[in-house]
Amino acid sequence: MSTTSSVRVRLAFVALLSATTFYCIHKYRRLKHLKNLSLNPSSTLKASRGKIFFISQTGTAKALAQRLHELCASNDIAFDIVDPHSYEPEDLPKETLVLFIASTWDGGKPPKNGEFLVNWLGESAEDFRVGSLLLSDCKFAVFGVGSRAYGESYNAVAKELSSRMIGLGGLEMIPVGEGDVDDGELDRAFQDWCDGVIRVLKGGSAQETNGVSQQIGAVEDDLEYYDSTDEEDEDNDADGGIVDLEDIAGKAPSKRNGVVKVTKVDGKKEMVTPVIRASLTKQGYKIIGSHSGVKICRWTKSQLRGRGGCYKHSFYGIESHRCMETTPSLACANKCVFCWRHHTNPVGKSWQWKMDEPSVIVKGALDLHKNMIKQMKGVPGVTPEKLQEGLNPRHCALSLVGEPIMYPEINALVDELHGRRISTFLVTNAQFPEKILMMKPITQLYVSVDAATKESLKAIDRPLFADFWERFIDSLKALQEKQQRTVYRLTLVKGWNTEELDAYFNLFSIGKPDFIEIKGVTYCGSSATSKLTMENVPWHTDVKAFSEALSLKSNGEYEVACEHAHSCCVLLGRTEKFKVDGKWFTWIDYEKFHDLVASGEPFTSTDYMAQTPSWAVYGAQEGGFDPGQLRYKKERNHPPKPQAVLA
């Protein structure tokens, strides 16, 4: 009995061993056969229509996919462009040729339209029941679009696609191509990769293209193109001229047509590439040198015409028609969800570009600003007196776009402005505490406080720094060290941060700002990079209610001082410093400030305060509108809404 059992076990073992050996031999021969085909694929690929998948959040990958499709068509190679969102991954084993153009979104994750496909590949590759030959009939290539600013997650999706496809038996025709949206070389990198793909598809050797991935993305800059600002909403006509990075990628000239190379000086390249310069110029910016910009604000135009000033006029007494809006750094360290520049200017964690001199920037900004003011001559409401005043700027809002405090010579630039008796309002995004500490006295220093908790700050600001929260808190602490006027700027986004009342109040004690500006987010139109809608825009009554609640929380330390209803903005002031005998002193004595700076002696924020006029005080019937100006309301000629008809 035992002998029979032993024989059966041996026979079963031999059968298993034979089957395993046969499987291994079959798999080896199959893979060897497919590998040989991959080196000369023309005989097998011509009969099959390939697919180009674009995995895209904002349209960059889609635009590149369209370029690749046109290139293939010009070479008589048939492809279909496919949005993976509408594709059934279970059909992938039927494909014989696929090309992926894949971008990487926040946290190294795929954009929404490619989530299901990427996840399906990942799950299949990890599922032992699927096997490693599922895609053995499929040849593929991958090009990734990402930003080195995000470190290890750079082109993570493209690399994962390649790994998963190989793990399922797919044959990679050429190495993964990697393009960086920041370095100005995306078009060249993509074209090199495309050339490699076409070469293989037309029967060339895959080995000829092995160097492609090494050539792509050699620059190590720490930036990304996107757009941001802290200032007032822009004229409606500016939106039509915006060029998104996706459009740039789609319309950029090919390598054969001659790509404009990025200018380098002493090994450092210019922050603003020719393509980005063209984009920002279409948005109304005047570019100064290689990294600065100036733009005329809608409120500057408004007060030139006598139609009212911005909230700074109501809160601090600036003359809006004499205010220049500029920045010495178009780069930033955040990608805020409420950013309305449609993500077309750089971001970075440190300064790595060619640097222009402060005097050159200030002179260039003033010259360009004055030229824009001159264009207002003859516009209805613009008097010769107002025009002449506008040609002599007295204020500078260093908050146009980007992070001005990143500019290494920011103190020297401030000196240039103060030397011309131009006041300075600088806004920082609270990611560079060491820069705040080293700042010389300026008229008013802002820190953007876009959220009150670590989780919501990450969701709203989308910062590049991994230690963004620590930097944020340290920036608030640094603010407390400053002797001049300091401000927290809160941007309320309904449904995102309006419920964090207690958390906001806890931040007050860290920086102890002189003022707290609370402003409702401005809706800037739909964008693939932003999920905000009009539902996220608070009413002025919402902003007032939030401000009053914060004031109550402070137990009298802060009170609501001013409002500017048109901008949906409210100001809290520190009562012990700026409320004297029941009257608010939020305005600034600008001449006194410049005298104090020129003296070289230490001074504080109360040394140059001035009384707030009654029309700007919170609760006044004017709502912060200067009665010396003429209120103008646009006529809305929208067709009337259809009335319900009762049967």
Curated annotation (Swiss-Prot):
Its EC number is 4.1.3.44. The keyword Cytoplasm does not apply. Gene3D superfamilies: 3.40.50.360, Aldolase class I (3.20.20.70). Residues 316-559 form the Radical SAM core domain. Binds 1 [4Fe-4S] cluster. The cluster is coordinated with 3 cysteines and an exchangeable S-adenosyl-L-methionine. GO terms for biological process: tRNA processing. Pathway: tRNA modification; wybutosine-tRNA(Phe) biosynthesis. It catalyses: N(1)-methylguanosine(37) in tRNA(Phe) + pyruvate + S-adenosyl-L-methionine = 4-demethylwyosine(37) in tRNA(Phe) + 5'-deoxyadenosine + L-methionine + CO2 + H2O. GO terms for molecular function: 4 iron, 4 sulfur cluster binding; FMN binding; metal ion binding; tRNA-4-demethylwyosine synthase activity. InterPro entries: Aldolase_TIM, Flavdoxin-like, Flavodoxin/NO_synth, Flavoprotein-like_sf, rSAM, tRNA_wybutosine-synth, tRNA_wybutosine-synthase. Probable component of the wybutosine biosynthesis pathway. Wybutosine is a hyper modified guanosine with a tricyclic base found at the 3'-position adjacent to the anticodon of eukaryotic phenylalanine tRNA. Catalyzes the condensation of N-methylguanine with 2 carbon atoms from pyruvate to form the tricyclic 4-demethylwyosine, an intermediate in wybutosine biosynthesis. This is S-adenosyl-L-methionine-dependent tRNA 4-demethylwyosine synthase. It comes from Arabidopsis thaliana.
